[in-house]
Structures are given as structure tokens and as C-alpha cells.
């Protein structure tokens, strides 16, 4: 029986999804990830839960960012904006307020080549989605572990996990369906595609699990206090994402149901923090454990059964 897993973006909230997946401990033929989902995907496909837990509970901000655009304070777990580096970045005309080469090195650490080889040996496919901003309008592309070389695939994971404005925009060439090479400017795959449902259409998956780093009752942004530029940008992006993402989300699930697939969504029980771009080890450890403990909680699970014709 073919089974697939889709994992959404969510930054540090990926620790909660990782704990949930560790509790489920299922085998999947295909795993599709965008943003933080692309980082979870390879080890989740191989059921390497201890290493995945280490990655999502022991990383710090220095493992993600090359320079800090905020600093944590005893009174605020979401951090306080560091204005000077942002002002300097704006004056210099940088594409983002910081870079994330440290994240690329962290991917090297937690996804060594023998795991990539093992994925292919077990015939498991990982698809990671990343957005090309050189295309107008910008377009998401999915890159497969079955078709990419090891170093290139890690680059695509990195591209997928880079949030616009905050982290690196990566310039990298890519090959189209006709074999022609083009140069792209890549960033977060989760901006316009929630979990990559289109990648599973017409492929006869009997069971599809979706780990969403969102709450079932979509948060309303009206009335939220916005303290600075960063919060303004993240709030605006998230508001637009909800409009784009959920407009066709359940319609696509229905299409999968008609095709004979059972779809199970695992939602967050609540909004975990104000800013998912803050990587706090203590908080992420708690989220991993809570994700593990509540994985089978009926309030988190939404099931859509196959529709018989």
C-alpha cells in the first residue's frame, strides 16, 4: 500500500511536528516538505527520530542565522528587535536582513550522505519545494531526491527553508523538463504552497498524512499588537498566506478522496509562539515532547475518507 507524508512550513514549530511524527512512527513511500518541512522530510522518511529530535531541540540561533536581527531577553521569549543591523542592511541594499549560511552547514551535519544513499536504496522519494523569484510571477518548483545529486539536494532543502526578508535568497541554476538550464533566485517554498498536495495527484496513494504547523481554527490577525517592522512583515506575509493557501486546500483534499485516498491532517492544538523564526532550545524541547504526547489526540486530527464512486 502506497503511503505519503506532507509536512508544512513553520520554522521552529517544526519541533512539534517532529514529535508528532516520532509518535506515529510510520513508513512512507514519498515525503513532501516545504520550508521547515523540507528539513524534517529526509530523517522522517528513514524513521531516524533520535537524530531528528537532536536537530530540533539542540539547535540555537547561531545554527540558523549568520547574524542576529533580534536578541532574546528574560522578559520576551519572542525576542527584541536589533535595529542597527537591519538599518545597515537596508542602507547597503541587501536582499535580506541577515544570511543563513549557518543553516546550510547545519543541514550538512544532520543529513550526511549515507542517509541520502539509504533513501535511494529503500526507494523512498523526498520532494522539497522552493520558490523561484526570477520567474514572473514567482513559481514554486519541487526537486526530488531521486533525480538530484547529494550536494544539489541539500541546496534545495536550504533554499526551501529560507524565509523571505529574514534569510538568504539563494542564486542557483536549475534544469527544466526539456533539459535546459536556467538561473533562479530561490527562497521559502511555503509562501505560496501549503504542503504540495498537487505533487500527489493521480499517483494512487491509499493513505496520505499531512502535518500542518497551523491550528485548525485559523488565527485571526486583526487586533494583534505589532511592535516593530519584523512583526509587521511576518504578520502581513502570514495573512496573505492564509488567503492563498486555504482557498483551494480542502478542494484538493476532496480530489484526492475521489481518487481513493484517505487523508489525515495533524493540526497544532494552538498557536505555539508569536514568532516561529525564534529558535529557543527550551521551548522547542517542550514542543517536541508535547507533539509526541498529543499525536493521537482527537482534537488535533481531522480525517477525510476516500469517496466511493
Spell out what each predicted region is.
Residues 1-34, 42-309:
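Patatin-like phospholipase
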